[in-house]
């Protein structure tokens, strides 16, 4: 079995990870430009990890302007085998209270201004049409590990959920939130898509 290296993308308020031991900062560039911030490598409980602040550590990049492709490319180039992300979300369901963890398994994309693929013929990628399957956009094995870790830590957890990702930076109107809830949305945020793709 190959060695696991975890990429961690932190969202709003998640800029420093105290659990990361022996941190080493590295600035990188990618064929898609610079990622949101420097990569910070270290170990958590003996596991190699690379942490990246999605909005940068100064919280200076709006959701629409995040270079999602550069972020993912940079983590892949650093050898990350898995990526775990944290996002600030709002609940669309009464059963999901603030502070509870929702392990996403589906998304509804309501963004309009973001590059959705690496395969658009730019940056040395193959030109032409490339249809990507996203019926199950989140890794079931990683989701199961997160569920077990949350339960072991006594963190209230919802083992599945559908996230509605909106363009931002504005929040949804009440009418939009009721619509998203009627579609089966559990939580709402501004960054899951296209990051998961």
Segments from the language model and where they lie:
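Metabolite-binding pocket within alpha/beta catalytic cores that recognizes anionic/polar moieties
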Residues: 1-134
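Active-site rim beta-loop-alpha module in soluble metabolic enzymes
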Residues: 135-181
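Positions that flank functional sites
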Residues: 90-91, 165, 195-196
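Glycine-rich anion-binding loop/nest that anchors nucleotide
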Residues: 9, 81-85, 161, 187-195
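Conserved active-site and cofactor/substrate-binding residues in soluble primary-metabolism enzymes
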Residues: 63-70, 78, 137, 141-145, ...
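A C-terminal functional module that forms or caps the active site or interfaces directly
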Residues: 174-197
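Short, flexible loop segments at the rims of nucleotide/cofactor-binding pockets, characterized by
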Residues: 59-64, 164-167, 184-185
């Amino acid at each position: 079995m190959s060695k696991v290296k975890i990429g961690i993308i932190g969202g709003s308020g998640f800029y420093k990870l105290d659990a990361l031991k022996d941190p080493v900062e590295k600035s990188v560039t990618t064929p898609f430009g610079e990622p949101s911030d420097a990569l910070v490598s270290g170990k958590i409980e003996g596991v190699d990890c690379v942490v990246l602040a999605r909005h940068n550590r100064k919280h200076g990049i709006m959701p629409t302007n995040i270079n999602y492709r550069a972020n993912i490319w940079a983590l892949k180039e650093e050898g990350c085998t898995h990526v775990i992300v944290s996002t600030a979300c709002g609940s669309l369901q009464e059963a999901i209270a603030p502070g509870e963890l929702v392990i996403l398994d589906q998304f509804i994309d309501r963004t309009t201004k973001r590059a959705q693929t690496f395969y658009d013929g730019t940056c040395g990628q193959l030109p032409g049409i490339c249809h990507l399957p996203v019926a199950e956009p989140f890794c079931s094995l990683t989701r199961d590990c997160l569920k077990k870790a949350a339960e072991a830590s006594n963190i209230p957890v919802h083992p599945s959920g559908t996230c509605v990702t909106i363009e931002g930076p504005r929040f949804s109107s009440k009418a939009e939130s009721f619509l998203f809830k009627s579609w089966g949305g559990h939580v709402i945020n501004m960054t899951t898509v296209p990051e998961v793709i």
